[in-house]
Design a protein with these regions (language model features):
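Residue-level signal for short, function-critical loop segments
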Residues: 15, 94, 149-150
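Short, glycine/charged-enriched secondary-structure capping and boundary segments
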Residues: 26, 53-56, 104-106, 136-139, ...
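Walker A (P-loop) phosphate-binding motif
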Residues: 2-41
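Cytosolic-facing regulatory segments adjacent to core modules
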Residues: 69-130, 155
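Phosphate-binding loop that captures ATP/GTP phosphates
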Residues: 31-90
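Short loop/turn elements that form and flank the Walker-type P-loop nucleotide-binding site
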Residues: 5, 34, 84-85, 117-118, ...
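Acidic-aromatic/histidine active-site loop/patch
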Residues: 1-8, 163, 167-169
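Conserved catalytic-core segment of NTP-binding enzymes
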Residues: 110, 116-121, 126-172
Length: 172
């Protein structure tokens, strides 16, 4: 049976500590209650907490996946994914933030294209830094949830973020 293309939803912000991870995990819970198969990808490469919150036992992370892709050792994306329960699976951020700068963003579309037909919903938790990896995830997203607080610094960053998206060709 062929599966429909899943929806990619990215939860992002230009500020840390606004609840991106909690929002992502709450959405995973909502979709799983609707019997939707969900993959949570933790692209907060400098301090991802999804694996910690879900008590992941998987030793392989997105860093291992990208390393194996770049060294032609990749076989199956399922080898890197931890199944939390019947409906929620995760692809964890690196355990060591020093690996974040060693990850080649060109593999992000390959990763997302490998999972988009395996899951009903792909939820992406990002870092607050607008880097190449975040640009790729935003570009491939069906829905972008941008979280912000009501302070002048964050509002200024939100305006800059929206300008960057508009300049990059994001219209909606």
């Amino acid at each position: 049976m062929e599966r429909n293309k899943g929806k990619i939803i990215t939860v992002t912000s230009t500020k840390g500590g606004v609840g991106k991870t909690i929002t992502t995990l709450n959405l995973a819970g909502v979709f799983s209650n609707l019997k939707k198969k969900v993959l949570v990808i933790d692209f907060d490469l400098y301090g991802g907490a999804v694996a910690t919150y879900l008590n992941s036992k998987n030793d392989k992370t997105i860093f291992n996946l990208i390393t194996d892709l770049s060294n032609n050792k990749y076989k199956n994306i399922d080898d890197y994914i931890y199944n939390h329960n019947e409906y929620i699976s995760i692809l964890s951020a690196p355990k060591d933030p020093r690996f974040a700068n060693k990850m080649d963003s060109k593999y992000i579309p390959i990763i997302l294209n490998n999972v988009v037909y395996k899951y009903d919903v792909i939820l992406i938790d990002t870092t607050h830094i607008l880097n190449e990896i975040n640009i790729y995830t935003l570009d491939m997203s069906d829905i972008i949830l941008y979280l912000f607080t009501n302070d002048s610094f964050d509002l200024k960053n939100t305006k800059s973020f929206l300008t960057i998206l508009k300049d990059a060709g994001f219209n909606n």
